[in-house]
């Protein structure tokens, strides 16, 4: 039991505190006899413990609030009629009431306190203290954040405190101006987060990502929802942006290269660095052959979420009974081939040479690869486009577009143009090139092959794409290579994949119109946004 005083936070009468417990202790605590409900962990055949998170098997965006005070009022990108997002306003009075609920829930209990860092660079990292009453929640943040050394722990002074009161409820939520009995609320002045009535671990992970997304760009550091890797010498860094289903994880996990991280990164004057100390991978339909790295990472100390196990601990990765969003969190050293431990002692590498935007275009319009200008980089970054095929009631499959600012709108606390400015500033200072890669469909009706996409990514890493002959395609005015080693030449111009080129033109005009309509929101009262219209599609 630790010698740590929580009365400074208004938490009193604790019956015991486990401070940064070891994995062995966490395993014992989350599987011990007598635990019931969602506190109870079940040991799987692979050694990892599986837990259930109740009705919340993902984040609850409608229940995310930020205290509207002098710190946040003029800086936060608030939810508005013009542009809906997840940054809902809470009053200081509501904050005080919610913190009281959390303090009451956490008082007179045995608690777990985990002190950890968010950010691999010492100058800009955030020291976070997590106060929780559930053992597996302590395990989750131990996996996902960067663990301090013994010396760092002895001198730990938190920059941010998270109170996880998942067992409590906000019964008077209506009078507090909330949407439900659940609340995930941030106070940027006191640097605290309160979580009430949701057990989902990702609220702590993405909560701290949102805070890095607030504080870092204000210091001139790019904060990014992306994966990143580098070559075996740790010098040729690449960043991959992309929404779910675009191949971000698949393409950044490359046996020829070293992984920096799979989800959250910053870019400062030293280079690109991971915010996290672990990975949080989807495991629905996980297969040992196709994703050996993730499968191999599921062992003791990994934590499975909402996966179906039988009485003997056998895992059914195909079972969606609880959710399709089944997950595993594990420390990054469960993966072979990472920068940390291979090139240096942290998940970081020099400035990126390539920035890759991944879009799975189900309209069949975008080229497999386009070379972007700085203005186009900002435009397509702010657009954050992908599309998926959705079946309609008549069995016709129609593309559904998704536009998510900066490929991570849910986690942006500042206006999207701020993230675009910081990214392009870093790119211009380092001579970084940006590419738009379509991992979706073309006129053949088939998805662009993973072989061709990997050939494109290899040509970007090697620099071969910079020497390739190019041409411009109409409406989008994108520069595309006309030949590229290891890639089928016939697919490089999407128009060539259509039996009738007029079909591509009709679809291109339709998609261009969707981009234009989506971008309109950036032009309202925003000169930076207006200036970028010319970089987008023109009709």
UniProtKB/Swiss-Prot annotation:
Compartments it resides in: Cytoplasm
Top-level lineage group: Bacteria
Enzyme Commission number(s): 4.1.1.49
InterPro entries assigned to the protein according to its UniProt record, in alphabetical order: PEP_carboxykinase_ATP, PEP_carboxykinase_C, PEP_carboxykinase_N, PEPCK_ATP_CS
One Pfam entry name: PEPCK_ATP
Gene Ontology cellular-component annotations: cytosol
PANTHER family the record matches: PHOSPHOENOLPYRUVATE CARBOXYKINASE (ATP), PHOSPHOENOLPYRUVATE CARBOXYKINASE ATP
Protein name per its UniProtKB record: Phosphoenolpyruvate carboxykinase (ATP)
Protein's gene: pckA
